[in-house]
Amino acid sequence: MANIEKKNHNDLQEKLITVNRVSKTVKGGRIFSFTALTVVGNGDGKVGFGYGKAREVPAAIQKAMEQARRNMITIPLVNKTLQHSLKGSHTGSNVFMKPASDGTGIIAGGAMRAVLEVAGIHNVLAKTYGSTNPINVVRATMNGLVNMKSPEMIAAKRNKRIKDILG
């Protein structure tokens, strides 16, 4: 059920990663509800994810999209790829992402691919280790992207010039 829906809203790309039917067992039977996992990005370094729950599918998707728009982060990109190799983890999922040269494309699987596409990353090599649960993979990917540092940030932290950092 990966990447079912893609549309634009205020220059944001929205992707639906997964919709899941869950049930609660009560005395009279089962109560079904739905969960939706979505990612939103502007294609230029801003990305966010949302997880919505509701009794109907459209309501769950709408809640997830709104949450994704509220929880957006900015990541520093260079030439539509990552600044450096990075790792991210969340519960049982571990992800490894590595910058790639022009023309490589997004080499990543499932939920991680959707996050990287809407973030505006065009060339990257990525691998998921451990659990491939879409929610955990998206959270691990976001954790990795949050920890990415640009040369400007490193130079400011070390009180050095950028050219000293880059060599």
UniProtKB/Swiss-Prot annotation:
Single Gene Ontology BP annotation: translation
GO cellular component: small ribosomal subunit
Claim: Phosphoprotein is one of the keywords in the record: no
Domain of life: Bacteria
Keyword set, alphabetical order: Ribonucleoprotein, Ribosomal protein, RNA-binding, rRNA-binding
One Gene Ontology molecular-function label: rRNA binding
Domain named S5 DRBM: residues: 12-75
Domain notes: The N-terminal domain interacts with the head of the 30S subunit; the C-terminal domain interacts with the body and contacts protein S4. The interaction surface between S4 and S5 is involved in control of translational fidelity.
HAMAP family: Ribosomal_uS5_B
Protein family membership: Belongs to the universal ribosomal protein uS5 family.
Protein function: With S4 and S12 plays an important role in translational accuracy. Located at the back of the 30S subunit body where it stabilizes the conformation of the head with respect to the body.
Self-association state and partner proteins as the record states: Part of the 30S ribosomal subunit. Contacts proteins S4 and S8.
Protein name: Small ribosomal subunit protein uS5
